[in-house]
C-alpha cells in the first residue's frame, strides 16, 4: 500500500507524467528532493511501472480499433497463445478472462481490409487458436489509462 502523500503524487503523475518534481513539491508543500526520493521508491516497489505518451490512433492512420475474443486449445496454465498474440505489432492488450473465452485482445489497424489480413495471416497462423470473435469499435466514448485512486 501507499501513504496519502504517495497517493497524491501518483494521482498527479497520472494526469501529467511530465510534471516536474518542483511543481509536485509546491502543490504538496514538500521539497523537490523529497518528491524525487518518493517517486524513485514508487518505481523500485513497482507501483510506477513506466511513463507513457498517449497517441491519437486516428491521426496515425490507424482508423480501426477492434476487440478479439479468443478460445484456445492451450492446456490449463499454459499461456503460449497469449504470448504469440502479444508479439503481434497490431495488438495493444491481451487479457486472460473468465467465461467461455480464454483471452480478450485489443487490436488497432489501418482499415477493415488491414484487420482482415491481420486476422487471416497473423492470428489465423496461431494453431492453438480454436475460435475467435471480432467486435469492431464504432465510437470510443472514453479511453483513459488512469486508475481510480482515491485520496
What annotation goes with each model-predicted range?
Residues 1-151:
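A compositional/biophysical signature of low hydrophobicity enriched in polar/charged and small residues
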Amino acid at each position: 500500500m501507499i501513504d496519502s502523500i504517495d497517493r497524491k503524487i501518483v494521482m498527479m503523475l497520472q494526469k501529467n507524467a511530465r510534471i516536474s518534481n518542483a511543481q509536485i513539491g509546491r502543490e504538496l508543500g514538500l521539497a523537490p528532493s523529497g518528491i524525487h526520493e518518493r517517486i524513485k521508491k514508487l518505481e523500485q516497489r513497482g507501483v510506477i511501472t513506466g511513463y507513457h505518451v498517449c497517441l491519437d490512433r486516428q491521426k496515425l492512420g490507424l482508423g480501426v480499433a477492434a476487440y478479439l475474443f479468443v478460445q484456445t486449445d492451450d492446456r490449463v496454465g499454459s499461456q503460449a497463445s497469449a504470448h504469440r498474440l502479444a508479439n503481434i505489432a497490431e495488438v495493444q492488450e491481451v487479457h486472460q478472462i473468465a467465461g467461455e473465452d480464454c483471452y480478450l485482445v485489443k487490436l488497432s489497424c489501418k482499415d477493415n481490409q488491414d484487420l482482415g489480413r491481420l486476422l487471416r495471416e497473423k492470428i489465423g497462423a496461431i494453431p492453438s487458436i480454436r475460435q475467435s470473435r471480432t467486435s469492431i469499435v464504432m465510437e470510443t466514448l472514453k479511453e483513459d489509462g488512469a486508475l481510480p485512486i482515491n485520496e
